[in-house]
Amino acid sequence: MLQTSIKKIHGKLKGSNLNTAEVIVNSFKRAEQVLELNSFISMNNNAGLQVESSNEYFKNGKPRSLLEGIPIAVKDNFCVKDTLTTCGSKMLQNFRPKYTATVVQKLLDSGAILVGKTNMDEFAMGSGTTTSIFGPTKNIWGSRFSNLCIQEKNDWFIPGGSSGGSAVAVASGICLGALGSDTGGSCRNPASYCGIVGLKPTYGLLSRYGLIPLVNSMDVPAIMALNVEDTACLLGIMMGRDENDSTTVSKNLNLALNYSSSSVKGLKIGIPAEYNCQGLSDEIRSAWNDIAKVLYQGGASIVPVSMPHTKYSIVCYSILNQCEVASNMARYDGIEFGLRSKEKGNRKNSYVTTRYSGFNEVVRSRIIAGNFFLLSSNSNKYYEKALKVRRLIADDFNNAWRKGINILLTPTTLTDAPKYSEYIKKDEREQSAIQDYCTQPANMAGCPAISIPIELSKKGFPISLQLMAPKFEEKTLLGCALYIENAVNFKNMNEQ
């Protein structure tokens, strides 16, 4: 039931061919069936109340939006009032916020029904959804729930991260849409590995209020769905100015797309040479070339472009990430909220033991590195220099836009989903340099980017590509993505 579009389910609900209770029961049953994938940290025990409310709107013939009665999932770093919001960390394992994140509230006010909170890397620091205190999430592709089970005992394929729980929830048919967050690719990476659509909107288009921060200058609420149309629907509901987030802008983007006859005629598509990098698989390189041909045949012009500072981007991103992490993590001191050590003695000892026991090694290492970069003797060598390089990276994008480029076409990830046993051979810092190579520049520049599935690899796993566009050009971005989606006709998990 939930491997179709929001519009189709809404039509059945509106036409009384289906009721909200059936949809949500189906969602929870599916979650139970694939429980071992560990995509959720907690389920919403109050979903029944939302179902009753939604049914009333349908009975009165006044559904609030296309999302009325539609099941959604939310990554566990978005606050939901009086609901466990853990960030996958021991530090917040009992934290229940007193307010709801703006983007979540907009979804709920539009009639969407929250199924649960999804698993994630601890504090969103990771690219595999392998570091949560609730255990790792497993990719449905290659599992016993897929048509091609090649998962070995005590091993599996990672879903990507850090929003892997949301990606698996959508890919496995538990919900029709999910919220993730994207700081350096945390939505697009798992979307790529799980064969779904993942959108990182322009920085400032969606409110960050209620999103527990990782890197304030790059964090963006992100959208995961089965198709481009559903992605646009979710974006349209959540975007807009929020007085609780000073970085948001008043932009009412027209996202109306012609879903039956999308076109790329006249678009100028840039192919950045620097993304043809070491480690890029031949299969993804081939898919990249094939889609460039598809766009050319559709009337777009294909233009080679250079983004010369891309090679510095991952190092620059790493430094800025760790500096902001060190600042943001300082609030978890065991005094105001979160875990508090039972260590007796002075406040300093309590502070140290709280943070040591509350954070995993990945988080602690980023805090230490960030504080090192921010030392007065080091700040100008690392932090300030990284800020300057970030400006040069943003200028690379701006130069492309000034030359008339409408869309940049690149890989999302360098390979298809790796096995867990292979992934953990490198630590998270090394993996970040690999997994985020193609995705984090868009966060550095603040521009929108989308990952869309293209085809299956030889081993039967999704291969995806990324599109990037100028700030607030989401309509162009989604339109181009829709054209590719229609051209490749990628089949989701249950359609394979």
From Swiss-Prot:
Coiled-coil stretches, from where to where?
none
**InterPro entries associated with the record:** Amidase, Amidase_dom, AS_sf, GatA
Tell me the SUPFAM superfamilies matching this sequence. Answer: Amidase signature (AS) enzymes
What's the stated role of this polypeptide?
A: Allows the formation of correctly charged Gln-tRNA(Gln) through the transamidation of misacylated Glu-tRNA(Gln) in the mitochondria. The reaction takes place in the presence of glutamine and ATP through an activated gamma-phospho-Glu-tRNA(Gln).
Name the record gives this protein: Glutamyl-tRNA(Gln) amidotransferase subunit A, mitochondrial
Protein localization: Mitochondrion
Name of encoding gene: gatA
Enumerate the Gene Ontology biological process terms. glutaminyl-tRNAGln biosynthesis via transamidation; mitochondrial translation
The GO terms describing molecular function are: ATP binding; glutaminyl-tRNA synthase (glutamine-hydrolyzing) activity
**Pfam families assigned to the protein according to its UniProt record, in alphabetical order:** Amidase
Query: EC?
Result: 6.3.5.7
Signal peptide, first to last residue: none
Q: Which HAMAP family match?
A: GatA
Query: Which residues does the Swiss-Prot or TrEMBL record annotate as the active site?
Result: 75, 162, 186
Q: Which GO terms describe its cellular component?
A: glutamyl-tRNA(Gln) amidotransferase complex; mitochondrion
